[in-house]
From Swiss-Prot:
Its EC number is 6.1.1.19. The keyword Cytoplasm applies. Keywords: Aminoacyl-tRNA synthetase, ATP-binding, Cytoplasm, Ligase, Nucleotide-binding, Protein biosynthesis. This is Arginine--tRNA ligase. It comes from the Bacteria. One of its GO terms (biological process) is arginyl-tRNA aminoacylation. It comes from Escherichia coli O139:H28 (strain E24377A / ETEC).
Amino acid sequence: MNIQALLSEKVRQAMIAAGAPADCEPQVRQSAKVQFGDYQANGMMAVAKKLGMAPRQLAEQVLTHLDLNGIASKVEIAGPGFINIFLDPAFLADHVQQALASDRLDVATPEKQTIVVDYSAPNVAKEMHVGHLRSTIIGDAAVRTLEFLGHKVIRANHVGDWGTQFGMLIAWLEKQQQENAGEMELADLEGFYRDAKKHYDEDEEFAERARNYVVKLQSGDEYFREMWRKLVDITMTQNQITYDRLNVTLTRDDVMGESLYNPMLLGIVADLKAKGLAVESEGATVVFLDEFKNKEGEPMGVIIQKKDGGYLYTTTDIACAKYRYETLHADRVLYYIDSRQHQHLMQAWAIVRKAGYVPESVPLEHHMFGMMLGKDGKPFKTRAGGTVKLADLLDEALERARRLVAEKNPDMPADELEKLANAVGIGAVKYADLSKNRTTDYIFDWDNMLAFEGNTAPYMQYAYTRVLSVFRKAEINEEQLAAAPVIIREDREAQLAARLLQFEETLTVVAREGTPHVMCAYLYDLAGLFSGFYEHCPILSAENEEVRNSRLKLAQLTAKTLKLGLDTLGIETVERM
């Protein structure tokens, strides 16, 4: 149920009947304050200006055409021409019943699209670090939301599995007589990478061999392809452990690395030349883009093939966008890549559009994000100033959560404690990130994220168990409760019901904007409203059974909404804390 969409259409029709143009925007928003109703239509100002009349006068005319019978109990004009809409308690009660009767909480399915989501993208032969966290968990929250809404989602894990470093790594493995790379741990590979790089920089003979190996690998030599595959396999096996720990839905089947697009690059460069988009410049192949200017104010040159014949990330990204449209048949492509890559992506996509590889009707969206910072406001590092490995971060989260949970539950059995600590620790790390607007940097703070107060995972998980505890105490008959009516008489009942029915609107925003923090804010607000409702509207000690059952149903929908909302974020719920 999308009340905002329903009201928007009703108000728009009334505005048109009052003389507004057919493309008018009613601007229906959820009201920020209770005294302004549940929703507010703010579109009169802009339209009245076009019509040359006072906004309040237009609002009055709109009201004469606005039929919200059975939806709103009161509609009033406020200030210069805002229309405040107060939802009818009977309407709320009816839709609470409908939500409870549906596995999907009465959330509609929009027109199905094929949506490719590019996220995580670690590098082969390197362990995942904290820099991969945001892309991985924000992208996964978007994927979960889009799938819940009924879209066909293709996860694309654009791993860095190609390039000159593979010649270097294979040469070093060979030199160490470690050809059976399958038995190596990734921790060894980290050291191998450093040692290989050191030799590559210092030993010209070794570097020459590494360069030859790259050529052999790229020409498809089976021995080198097999060594390369081992490196990829070791890395992705290790990464899968991290994905599983993070409760992220990526699997090995979702890997679409840079190597996938390599066979396309020669043809793309030739095609861009044939179309007159790419030209030779100082030995390299370049596309000049009028949309981007260099320091001299001239069109910026984007290199797609170097003098030595090598390709660049831009070339791969052009091929990648083309593949996602032509082969995967994407209707929409989302990229969860940090904000520093924005210009690079915009340039690649400008070339993609000019070449006609992806039509304008298919959005290519950069859902960029800021950095994770330490308390000092600088990029998050180890005490020694090194990069924090993601596995180490999750180990620490688990250890801190274990202490926290044991403190609160000294008699809890060990296996139960471990399960709870895992849900709380991993949930805390994820929720701390997801609850911040992705476009900004954020401070990583253990104390804040593991607190049981405020907009945190432990608070949300506890809020869920608190609602469940009502049912444990109530000893309800499920069939009896299902048949009982919902009756809304108190303001706090109405406020909670209205917020519960805004779940679909919240999902719609997350699906459109790729902003999981909107869901976090909604769930936190919902938990707060339930707390106020629980305090002021007795459930188990209600004045009669009818009121008791009605309030139990509001509690039931709260529990279902919290669980489903947290699930779209990839945050695990628990039955007891």
